[in-house]
From Swiss-Prot:
Gene: mrnCL
Keyword Hydrolase: yes
Name of the protein in its database record: Mini-ribonuclease 3-like protein
Family under the similarity heading: Belongs to the MrnC RNase family.
InterPro entries: Mini3_fam, RNase_III_dom, RNase_III_sf
Length: 129
């Protein structure tokens, strides 16, 4: 983590670049949460897969977007409006765009060292709020 250049302005990253990073962070945080329960690997994969997919991430995006700082709303909107060329068949185009927006927000929070904000979002997932 020490090799990441945090001095680059967050606006210099595209929405898709932020989503690329946010996707990895999202999955890592969800995996870390479920790992603590001592589940076997197939069970871990089942639980993680239920939370790391566009349909679910779209729901989380809708829950959090109105409560975010304006800076993160703008990042989410920019990512949502990115020129995404392919979409999975497991969700609608809008769900995929909203999931991309959530991932971009998570990626931006990570680069801005807003770990507590990421934890708040993860807690929504964990507590099912």
């Amino acid at each position: 983590m020490d090799n990441v250049d945090f001095s680059k302005d967050i606006r210099d990253y595209s929405g898709l670049e932020l989503a690329f990073l946010g996707d990895a962070i999202w999955e890592l945080e969800i995996r870390k949460y479920y790992l603590q329960f001592g589940y076997n690997i197939p069970t871990l994969n089942k639980y993680v897969k239920a939370k790391v997919n566009a349909k679910y991430q779209s729901l989380i995006y809708k829950k959090i977007i109105n409560d975010l700082d304006e800076e993160f709303k703008v990042i989410g909107k920019r990512a949502k409006n990115s020129n995404i060329k392919t979409f999975p068949r497991s969700c609608t185009v809008m769900e995929y765009k909203e999931a991309t927006a959530l991932e971009a927000i998570i990626g931006a929070m990570y680069l801005l060292k807003k770990e507590e904000e990421i934890k708040k979002i993860i807690n929504i997932v964990i507590k099912g709020e």
